[in-house]
């Protein structure tokens, strides 16, 4: 399912790369995770079956696990809002009812390993987001670092920024708090995942404000927002066997279509990507995935 239509029951106020967001009332939003998948800031023309359900269940797992206030409103959405019943087949298993908060306009990225764009920057300048890093090789573990980016509008590209630039956007005091919270959350999740055979190389958090409280929002530690590696096959100095979008990115790059609009994934790429998401879910939660 790559799009939703609630036929005006609630207004659609935003359509992200994956999520359709509906306004329930002044204080409440409905997040619906579709099966859309994006890579290199472009949405593929076809989706990954039930990917939205996997992301939703995994986010719920981490919301429960992590010791921080989050935006989730628990309960059966169809009991709370009977008018949604006709759309059960669109919403069930892939919807989260959440508090509407003031969003902090940063992509809060924490890196515990040098890979991806961080590795590319390091090769040029021995820095990651302007932070000097000692001598390392690809995929090497480092002390976790906060590497924010701008939160771009749909169709625009997020831009990597320094901590000092982030300070100017949200204020130094708030940015310092966000940095500490994000690194603490990453570290707790990383240590847990290690017991399940998964390395969390990096991840992206998003936060909102409820008064002065920093609240965890959006999705949390999913294969869409993180790099998950197979710990059993981890080998420093090379690219890793992963449970995330890297498989799709590699296919796009090798076929010369990275960043191009309207690309359709062949069935084998869809199937393999789905299996990686399912494996990540099952390893991290200990639960068997049920379609």
From Swiss-Prot:
GO MF entries: ATP binding; phosphoribosylaminoimidazolesuccinocarboxamide synthase activity
Pathway: Purine metabolism; IMP biosynthesis via de novo pathway; 5-amino-1-(5-phospho-D-ribosyl)imidazole-4-carboxamide from 5-amino-1-(5-phospho-D-ribosyl)imidazole-4-carboxylate: step 1/2
Gene Ontology CC annotations of this record: cytoplasm
Enzyme Commission number(s): 6.3.2.6
Pfam families to which the protein is assigned, alphabetical: SAICAR_synt
Keyword annotations of the record: ATP-binding, Ligase, Nucleotide-binding, Purine biosynthesis
Coiled coil: none
Catalytic activity, reaction form: 5-amino-1-(5-phospho-D-ribosyl)imidazole-4-carboxylate + L-aspartate + ATP = (2S)-2-[5-amino-1-(5-phospho-beta-D-ribosyl)imidazole-4-carboxamido]succinate + ADP + phosphate + 2 H(+)
InterPro entries, sorted: SAICAR_synt/ADE2_N, SAICAR_synth, SAICAR_synthetase_CS
BP term (GO), one: 'de novo' IMP biosynthetic process
Stored SUPFAM superfamilies: SAICAR synthase-like (SSF56104)
Protein family (similarity comment): Belongs to the SAICAR synthetase family.
PANTHER family in UniProt: PHOSPHORIBOSYLAMINOIMIDAZOLE-SUCCINOCARBOXAMIDE SYNTHASE
Record-given protein name: Phosphoribosylaminoimidazole-succinocarboxamide synthase
Native source organism of the sequence: Candida maltosa
């Amino acid at each position: 399912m790559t799009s939703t239509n609630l036929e005006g029951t609630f207004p659609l106020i935003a359509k992200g790369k994956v999520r359709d967001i509906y306004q329930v009332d002044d204080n409440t939003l409905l997040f619906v995770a579709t099966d859309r998948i994006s890579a290199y800031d472009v949405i593929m023309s076809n989706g990954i079956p039930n990917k939205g359900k996997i992301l939703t269940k995994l986010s719920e797992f981490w919301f429960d696990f992590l010791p921080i206030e989050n935006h989730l409103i628990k309960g059966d959405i169809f009991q709370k809002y009977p008018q949604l019943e006709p759309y059960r087949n669109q919403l069930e298993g892939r919807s989260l009812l959440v508090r509407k908060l003031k969003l902090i306009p940063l992509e809060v990225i924490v890196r515990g390993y040098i890979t991806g764009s961080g590795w590319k920057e390091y090769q040029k300048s021995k820095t990651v987001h302007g932070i000097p890093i000692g001598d390392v090789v690809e995929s090497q573990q480092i002390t976790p670092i906060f590497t924010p980016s701008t939160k771009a509008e749909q169709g625009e590209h997020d831009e990597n920024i320094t901590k000092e630039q982030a300070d100017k956007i949200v204020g130094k005091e708030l940015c310092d708090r966000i940095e500490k919270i994000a690194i603490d959350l990453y570290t707790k999740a990383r240590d847990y995942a290690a017991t399940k055979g998964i390395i969390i190389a990096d991840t992206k958090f998003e936060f909102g404000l409820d008064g002065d409280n920093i609240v965890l929002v959006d999705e949390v530690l999913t294969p869409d927002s993180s790099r998950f590696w197979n710990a059993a096959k981890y080998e420093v100095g090379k690219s890793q066997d992963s449970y995330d979008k890297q498989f799709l990115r590699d296919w796009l790059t090798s076929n010369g279509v990275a960043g191009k609009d309207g690309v359709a994934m062949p069935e084998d790429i869809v199937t393999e990507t789905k299996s990686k998401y399912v494996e990540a879910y099952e390893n991290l939660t200990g639960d068997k995935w049920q379609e």
